[in-house]
Amino acid sequence: MEIIPAIDIKDGRCVRLYQGDFAQMTVYADDPVAVARSWEAQGATRLHLVDLDGARAGHPQNVDAILAITQAVQIPVQLGGGLRREQDVESALALGVERVIIGTAAIAETDLVARLLDRFGEQIVIGIDARNGLVATDGWTVTSSVKATVLAEQMANLGARRIIYTDISRDGALSGPNFAALSELITPHGPAIIASGGIASIDHVRQLAQLGVEGAIIGKALYVGAVKLAEAMAVAHMTNV
């Protein structure tokens, strides 16, 4: 299982939100490039970037910071937040991002997602963000009537090979992942699942690895020191062996 540090960017700074609430924001660093370099130096094999301003605006906002990060590190970077048009996806990939995460468009524009999957294959990752089992969109400000499990099946049928599942109520709360919801998404021949939200301890990392997810995105727990990256990577590796 891969451990993926998260870097959430707002106004060019590295921040964390509590349950996606912009009013409950903590700034962890003014320079996200330095943060990215630090995670790489500590052994990270991939970084998870979120353009929070982009998620709310519906199109990318922190382009300069994202480009600076992709130029500063040698490890692959995946990006989410406001990527809802084909040209935005193209632009993100041109910045040096390896994977692009499609969230809102997965519900709003199925034809677009099908086209993107056809064009870019594994470079497209579906982001399913759920609140009480229902998919949330538009920077988590809108909760749909679509079940996360239903959307996951639809995306798999379109050819999606990878899904990032975020439980919004757990995100930034250090309350533990939603293991039950994750287990519902893992199928023998379905898309690989990456877990995001709520990881607060090494035990959570071990449980996720045992559950069979491909990766675990960790944000707040790394920034507050509740989880050490090297230890998490070691546990994830040992559990997989």
Swiss-Prot record:
One Pfam family hit: His_biosynth
Domain of life: Bacteria
Catalysed transformations (reactions): 1-(5-phospho-beta-D-ribosyl)-5-[(5-phospho-beta-D-ribosylamino)methylideneamino]imidazole-4-carboxamide = 5-[(5-phospho-1-deoxy-D-ribulos-1-ylimino)methylamino]-1-(5-phospho-beta-D-ribosyl)imidazole-4-carboxamide
Pathway in which the depicted protein is active: Amino-acid biosynthesis; L-histidine biosynthesis; L-histidine from 5-phospho-alpha-D-ribose 1-diphosphate: step 4/9
Gene Ontology biological-process annotations: L-histidine biosynthetic process; L-tryptophan biosynthetic process
Positions of the catalytic residues: 8, 129
CDD domains according to UniProt: HisA
EC id: 5.3.1.16
Keywords: Amino-acid biosynthesis, Cytoplasm, Histidine biosynthesis, Isomerase
Primary site of residence: cytoplasm
InterPro entries per UniProt: Aldolase_TIM, His_biosynth, HisA_bact_arch, Isoase_HisA-like, Isoase_HisA-like_bact, RibuloseP-bd_barrel
A GO term, aspect molecular function: 1-(5-phosphoribosyl)-5-[(5-phosphoribosylamino)methylideneamino]imidazole-4-carboxamide isomerase activity
Gene Ontology, cellular component aspect: cytoplasm
Subcellular localization(s) per the UniProt record: Cytoplasm
Family from the record: Belongs to the HisA/HisF family.
NCBIfam families associated with the record: 1-(5-phosphoribosyl)-5-[(5-phosphoribosylamino)methylideneamino]imidazole-4-carboxamide isomerase
PANTHER family in UniProt: 1-(5-PHOSPHORIBOSYL)-5-[(5-PHOSPHORIBOSYLAMINO)METHYLIDENEAMINO] IMIDAZOLE-4-CARBOXAMIDE ISOMERASE
Protein known as: 1-(5-phosphoribosyl)-5-[(5-phosphoribosylamino)methylideneamino] imidazole-4-carboxamide isomerase
Natural source organism: Chloroflexus aurantiacus (strain ATCC 29364 / DSM 637 / Y-400-fl)
Biological classification of the source: Bacteria, Bacillati, Chloroflexota, Chloroflexia, Chloroflexales
